[in-house]
């Protein structure tokens, strides 16, 4: 499948071929959902904490005598039913960590990329060099305006291009990531995905490992003549 190749001014300069493994990959919505839930859960710090009756300051003295007052007996002012008392079954520090194996992560990422291709919302950008790169936020804003991507977009750049990544940090409705850090959650949350040629090459070779796979050649079957010769 071919997608349009865009230069840094927003003009179409050619086509870019996308691997058939990405185009023909089935879209597994359940796996994508599981990947997003795992990603969001791993972002949680889990540092929430409330104090129980044994941790609240004070309450060491018995507030009033056991008998003779007509009130319900009480041994401390830090009981959960008292104002300023401890919290019962409140949140405690915990880990929300979830795990996905490499095969599931790769499958979720392939599903989101295949969906973006089917919706024609994946744009391949010409590689940056010393003469055409995002040296200022203005340059990045002009490119996005020329592409007419008003909604939330994901810009994937080569990991070594730190200057271009910094130039897009102050633009609304755009998330910039290195091709080494791309994940299914970021792709699924974005309306458009813009990626450079180096970025998509790095993604295919290092993350998806599509071009490194070698076909296993089957051994030729022995014929009757070969069998007789071996005997």
Question: What positions do the PLM features span?
Answer:
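Extended polybasic, low-complexity segments that bind anionic RNA or targeting/receptor surfaces
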Residues: 1-41, 45, 90-231
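Short coil/turn segments at secondary-structure boundaries
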Residues: 47-53
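Glycine/serine-rich anion-binding loops at beta->alpha junctions
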Residues: 53-89
């Amino acid at each position: 499948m071919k997608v349009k190749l865009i230069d840094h001014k927003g003009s179409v300069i050619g086509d870019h071929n996308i691997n058939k493994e990405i185009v023909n990959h089935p879209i597994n919505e359940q796996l994508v959902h599981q990947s997003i839930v795992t990603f969001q859960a791993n972002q949680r710090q889990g540092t929430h904490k409330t104090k129980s009756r044994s941790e609240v300051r004070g309450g060491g003295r018995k507030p009033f005598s056991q008998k003779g007052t007509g009130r319900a007996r009480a041994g401390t002012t830090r009981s959960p039913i008292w104002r300023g008392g401890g919290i019962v079954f409140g949140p405690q520090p915990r880990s929300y960590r979830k795990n996905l194996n490499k095969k599931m992560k790769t499958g979720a990422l392939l599903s989101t990329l295949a969906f973006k291709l089917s919706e024609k919302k994946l744009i391949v950008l010409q590689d940056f060099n010393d003469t055409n790169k995002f040296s200022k936020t203005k340059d990045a804003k002009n490119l996005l305006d020329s592409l007419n991507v008003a909604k939330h977009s994901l810009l994937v750049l080569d990991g070594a291009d730190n200057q271009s990544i910094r130039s897009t940090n102050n633009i609304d409705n755009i998330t910039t990531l290195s091709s080494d850090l791309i994940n299914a959650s970021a792709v699924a949350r974005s309306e458009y995905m813009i990626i450079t040629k180096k970025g998509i090459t790095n993604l295919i070779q290092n993350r998806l490992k599509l071009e490194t796979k070698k076909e296993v050649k089957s051994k030729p079957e022995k014929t009757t003549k070969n069998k007789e010769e071996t005997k």
